[in-house]
Amino acid sequence: MASQLTDAFARKFYYLRLSITDVCNFRCTYCLPDGYKPGGVTNNGFLTVDEIRRVTRAFASLGTEKVRLTGGEPSLRRDFTDIIAAVGENDAIRQIAVTTNGYRLARDAANWREAGLTGVNVSVDSLDARQFHAITGQDKFRQVMAGIDAAFDAGFEKVKVNTVLMRDVNHHQLDTFLAWIQPRPIQLRFIELMETGEGSDLFRKHHISGQVLRDELIKRGWIHQLRQRSDGPAQVFCHPDYAGEIGLIMPYEKDFCATCNRLRVSSVGKLHLCLFGDGGVSLRDLLQDDAQQYALEERISDALREKKQTHFLHQSNTGITQNLSYIGG
């Protein structure tokens, strides 16, 4: 079939976020504050390497150029390097990235790079080791920082760092973050805290609009960059005096969904049209044999007709997303 995925609102989809596990070994306050709780899925229930190969092949045939491997914590999969290589078999996929807590980055960055990984996002919500421990439940700050250094040593030209913006936690630490990226080619992405089914109280207490940071950046001479078609949702800013960049992800901003270019597949093979949508379309029965590819592509394309124009976060409707590890954040 090989036609570009397009929805009823003429949005084109070049970017797949593929969750390969919902297991995580961190207990971040905004995601899994009580730690990982199995939802009836064993490690054997997650997508296999062959299933991942087939689903990414179908998306590549439908115009996908970028695949981001998410979790949970993707690197907890023992076959993670094999998964990277399987995705990389598709020549049409130009970028293969991972979002990781950095737990195994120092050990494995070079192997991931060799397998075909082209991009790394690391979650770092504070540059203070004690606060990092308090947020994540893990005393691993120095290990994660060493992992970022290892990523550069392995040949990644830029590392993206995700920081969830939280009122009275880290929103006042802009100067500290800017000093950190001034000599380093790091794109630091501040992500507005999003409400989830399990996180409503935390959201009400700590949400702050990214507009506050955007106004401050513009006042300091930071310049808004143009997005590429397979980029994520961040508004990216650069400054001539800084090697690093700042990204702002503001899902509550008007028209945030107008430029949506990404779809999600969960670790058990469900297609999700929106992080905060309802339900999901099972693809797994069509991931068992290479001969099913045409039917798989048809199911993906047909499902896209149901994609809504926007999320409904403004009405506190978080859809199926009980926490951000559920379908890969």
UniProtKB/Swiss-Prot annotation:
Binding of GTP occurs at: R17, R68, T99, K160, R262, L263, R264
The uppermost taxa in this organism's lineage are: Bacteria, Pseudomonadati, Pseudomonadota, Gammaproteobacteria, Enterobacterales
GO biological process: any one? Mo-molybdopterin cofactor biosynthetic process
Instruction: Identify the residues that the record assigns to the Radical SAM core domain, covering every copy.
Output: 8-234
Which organism is the protein's source? Salmonella typhimurium (strain LT2 / SGSC1412 / ATCC 700720)
Q: Which reaction does it catalyse?
A: GTP + AH2 + S-adenosyl-L-methionine = (8S)-3',8-cyclo-7,8-dihydroguanosine 5'-triphosphate + 5'-deoxyadenosine + L-methionine + A + H(+)
Pathway as given in its UniProt record: Cofactor biosynthesis; molybdopterin biosynthesis
> Which NCBIfam families does this one have?
moaA
What EC number(s) does the entry state? 4.1.99.22
Q: Which UniProt keywords apply?
A: 4Fe-4S, GTP-binding, Iron, Iron-sulfur, Lyase, Metal-binding, Molybdenum cofactor biosynthesis, Nucleotide-binding, S-adenosyl-L-methionine
Q: State the disulfide connectivity.
A: none
Q: How does it assemble?
A: Monomer and homodimer.
Official protein name in the record: GTP 3',8-cyclase
Co-factor note (free text): Binds 2 [4Fe-4S] clusters. Binds 1 [4Fe-4S] cluster coordinated with 3 cysteines and an exchangeable S-adenosyl-L-methionine and 1 [4Fe-4S] cluster coordinated with 3 cysteines and the GTP-derived substrate.
Sites where the protein binds [4Fe-4S] cluster 2 = C257, C260, C274
A molecular-function term among this protein's GO annotations? S-adenosyl-L-methionine binding
EC class name: lyase
Please give the superkingdom of this protein's source.
Answer: Bacteria
- Binding-site residues, [4Fe-4S] cluster 1: C24, C28, C31
- Residues reported to bind S-adenosyl-L-methionine: Y30, G72, S123, M194
Task: Family membership, please give it.
Answer: Belongs to the radical SAM superfamily. MoaA family.
User: What role is this protein assigned?
Assistant: Catalyzes the cyclization of GTP to (8S)-3',8-cyclo-7,8-dihydroguanosine 5'-triphosphate.
Cofactor(s) it depends on: [4Fe-4S] cluster
Q: Read off the InterPro entries from this record.
A: Aldolase_TIM, Elp3/MiaA/NifB-like_rSAM, MoaA, MoaA_NifB_PqqE_Fe-S-bd_CS, MoaA_twitch, MoCo_biosynth_MoaA/MoaC, rSAM
Q: Which Pfam families match?
A: Mob_synth_C, Radical_SAM
